Regions:
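Leucine-rich solenoid repeat scaffolds
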Residues: 586-637
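A structural signal for leucine-rich repeat
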Residues: 202-209, 227-234, 251-258, 275-282, ...
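Acidic, low-complexity intrinsically disordered segments
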Residues: 112-146
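Conserved hydrophobic beta-strand positions in leucine-rich repeat
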Residues: 180-182, 214-218, 235-242, 262-266, ...
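LRR N-terminal entry segment and analogous cap-like coil->beta motifs
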Residues: 152-228, 232-234, 238, 246
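A structural signal for beta-rich interaction modules in eukaryotic proteins
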Residues: 7-125
Length: 637
């Protein structure tokens, strides 16, 4: 966007200095096209968002015909509003006291040559309280040694472009204005009254305007009904976001016509009844988001048809039955999110053959007995976080040839015996953390040839000797944190060593880590992250010989390490961060000879050394550009 900065500064100066000329329009260039921007003040209690004819203020008067034209299509505007406009224009002695009482800003953008209005925005509640808002203070500053009425000096050095001005007021200008964004949740302080939109009395649209409007964002305001849209031409609207408001009823949505609407977002409201969606006139709707409401009953949508719907988000509601899916039509539904509801029976969705992502987290169905009945040939991701599941036996008969992610964390699974019979040839991510699993040997028989990530942390695993039988040769992430593991010698000859990038063994009972430096160990050629913190390690003397040449971060905090002489010999070219917090290190002098040219951070908090006795080592590291962190994360906060 090319903008004439001098014109903007001159304009703002004139607009906010009540003692100067009444001309309140200036020219700008927007996307290589010329426009005219007009801002003015008047006194009333309405917010209007219209596209009525542009009116310009020249000199001290405004022709009556212009006024009439300006309001010819606006409904419910009191006569005193028109009088306020004329009074403002004709006034030659507007004082700061009157200025502080003004509570409306008009912002009007029009094409320079044709005079056609691109948009017009009315902002209410500009009063003395508003003037104390941080955003307003950024614009004006009282001149030194001057009277109170001279709040006209611009002090915000960042207010150099129209984009900045727009962002401050939550506006979005894009060429011929096909998008309107009135999000309250912007960079302004959330206590600001500037962009609070409530009922239709405060948000009025002019009929038959914005014919090219295809995106409307009104999220995070105080809208409580959909009647505010009744005067808006929705013929070309493709995207409508009303999330984060106070909408409890969507009854009027069936009166609206959305022939081209593709995405409707009604999340974070107070909607309970969705029956009116059954008759919504949105024939090509593809994405419907009803998450974070108070919906309980979906059966009212029985026999409804959603021929083009691809994404349906019902998460974080109080839904206890999804029977309506049996009789409703979702021929191409790909994404279904039922996260955090009260559904016990998932069988009604088994026929949704086009599903690619299914999220069933935190529902109390406890068993996956519906899986063998599922016609999910296209399914790529399925999530069962915290569903009280006790067995994985039903997975052996599930036919998911394209499954990539299987997530079963935070359940009550103890045995995974039947996983030896499971065949998911494209599976890349398996999450079984937060269960009660002790024996992982069945995984050595599972047919997961494409597996890249395996998460087994927070279980009761003690023995990992079966890892060398795992056929996951492509594995890049293995997490075994928070188990009961003490022996890790199996890593001498595990088949996935070469490709592994992250190995997490934190919070176990490991004492001996010599396996990493044993000459017979298969190289961890691509390993970048090695987590060994919160164990019982006291000796790292041979760590410099470890086959981890590409290592970037080593976590050794919360162990029993005393000597760190190994760092004199260590020469890992990519190593950038070492965590040695909470050990019993008393001497830092070996760090003086450190050769790790890419090392950026070394964590040394809560050790036994005395800082004054180790200043030379600390200063040497600092001179090499290595940050020595002597406080824990908690202390830093």
């Amino acid at each position: 966007m090319n903008t004439n900065i001098d014109n903007i500064n001159e304009f703002i100066r004139k607009t906010f200095d009540p003692l100067t000329t009444r001309k309140e329009s200036f020219n700008i260039r927007l996307n290589y096209k010329e426009y005219k921007l007009t801002i003015s003040f008047l006194q009333n209690n309405y917010i209007l968002f219209t596209c009525k004819s542009n009116f310009d203020f020249y000199g001290n008067s405004l022709h009556k015909n212009d006024v009439n034209n300006s309001f010819q299509n606006i409904e419910n505007i009191p006569a005193n509003v028109k009088n306020d406009i004329i009074s403002l224009i004709n006034s030659n002695n507007l004082s700061i006291k009157e200025f502080l009482n003004l509570n409306m800003i008009i912002i009007c953008l029009s094409e320079k040559n044709t005079g056609d209005t691109i948009f017009e925005f009315f902002l209410n509640k500009l009063n003395e309280k508003t003037m104390n808002n941080d955003v307003i203070k950024m614009l004006f500053k009282k001149k030194e040694n001057k009277q109170e009425d001279e709040y006209n000096k611009i002090i915000n050095s960042n207010l150099n472009t129209l984009e900045t001005f727009n962002r401050m007021y939550g506006l979005s200008i894009k060429g011929n204005e096909t998008e309107i964004n009135l999000t309250f949740n912007n960079k302004m302080n959330k206590s600001s009254p500037l962009l609070k939109i409530t009922t239709k009395g405060f948000l009025l649209f002019c009929k038959n305007k914005f014919l090219n409007l295809n995106k409307l964002v009104l999220k995070n305001n105080e809208i409580n009904e959909l009647n505010i849209l009744h005067n808006l031409d929705t013929t070309n609207l493709k995207y409508l976001d009303l999330s984060g408001n106070n909408i409890s009823s969507i009854e009027s949505i069936s009166d609206l016509n959305f022939p081209k609407l593709e995405k409707l977002i009604l999340s974070k409201n107070q909607i309970k009844d969705v029956i009116y969606l059954k008759n919504i006139r949105a024939p090509i709707l593809r994405d419907l988001d009803l998450s974070m409401n108070q919906i309980q009953n979906l059966d009212v949508l029985n026999s409804s048809s959603w021929p083009h719907l691809k994404s349906f988000d019902l998460s974080y509601n109080q839904i206890n039955s999804i029977e309506f899916f049996k009789n409703a039509s979702f021929p191409i539904l790909e994404y279904l999110n039922l996260n955090t509801n009260l559904v016990k029976n998932m069988e009604p969705i088994t026929h949704l053959s086009k599903l690619t992502i299914l999220i069933l987290n935190q529902n109390p169905f406890s068993q996956m007995d519906f899986l063998p009945k599922c016609d999910f040939k296209n399914l790529k991701e399925i999530y069962f976080y915290s569903c009280n599941i006790t067995t994985v036996q039903y997975l052996q008969n599930a036919k998911f040839p394209n499954l990539i992610t299987l997530s079963l964390p935070e359940n009550n699974i103890t045995y995974i015996t039947t996983l030896r019979y499971v065949n998911f040839p494209k599976l890349k991510k398996l999450s079984l953390y937060g269960n009660n699993i002790e024996d992982i040997t069945p995984l050595q028989y599972a047919n997961f040839p494409s597996l890249l990530e395996l998460y087994l942390y927070q279980n009761n695993i003690k023995n990992i000797s079966c890892l060398n039988q795992f056929k996951f040769t492509k594995l890049i992430t293995l997490s075994l944190m928070s188990n009961q593991i003490s022996d890790i010698n199996v890593f001498k000859n595990t088949q996935f060593n070469f490709n592994l990038e992250t190995l997490a063994l934190s919070k176990n009972k490991i004492k001996d880590i010599s396996v990493f430096s044993d000459y017979s160990t298969i190289s961890f050629y691509n390993l970048k992250e090695l987590w060994l913190d919160h164990n019982e390690i006291n000796n790292i003397d041979k760590l410099d010989k470890a086959k981890i040449n590409k290592i970037v971060r080593i976590k050794l905090g919360h162990n029993l390490i005393q000597k760190i002489n190994v760092f004199e010999r260590m020469n890992f070219f990519a190593l950038a961060e070492i965590d040695l917090n909470n050990n019993v290190i008393s001497d830092l002098s070996p760090l003086v000879w450190i050769k790790l040219r890419n090392l950026k951070k070394i964590h040394l908090a809560n050790n036994s050394f005395i800082i004054n006795n180790n200043n030379y080592a600390l200063n040497t590291l600092n001179n090499k550009g290595i940050q020595c962190i002597l406080q824990s994360e908690e202390e830093q906060k």
